[in-house]
Each structure stands twice: as structure tokens, then as C-alpha cells.
């Protein structure tokens, strides 16, 4: 069974976050992983949803995963730090995205 990876990266205040998340997802899927991309899950909630509403959905998605993959800039994000804390509590494997992209062009 393929490992399921959760992408953790800053979204709030990052204008091109969809491009960043989608590019990372493509690289990881191409490497044979199942990827949970929270940036693509915004359709689950309506336009009036709060940051906390999104975090609840994100945390549920994280619970379904085996590995937390941290995108550049994660450490500056409150939401990413919450995801990191949950991953630590659950003894999940935690990896930096750059581990997957060493030697890969345009990753």
C-alpha cells in the first residue's frame, strides 16, 4: 500500500499558494505517493468559512495520512505549526519537501 502524504505549507497571505501546492503534489504523485493536498480542498467549505473551519477539515485530513511533508515557509504559518504539533503527537514521519526534490528540476 502506498504511503499517504499530507502537504503542509503556508496558504494565508501567499498569492500563488495553489501553484506551489499543486506543483509539489505533482512531483510526489509522480514519485508514486498518494498525496493529500489541503489547498485543493477549499470546495468543502463555503466562502464564509473561518480559518478555524478550514483548520478542522485540514486536521481531519492529516489524521488519514502517514507522513507530513513540510513545504518551504511552513515554520512561519500558525496552521502549519498546528499540523506539525499533531504530527508529533501521532508519531508521524515528518519530512521536508526538499528531501523529495534533491536533483529534480522545476520541483
Region locations from a protein language model:
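Conserved catalytic or regulatory cores that recognize and/or transform ribose-phosphate-containing ligands
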Residues: 1-107
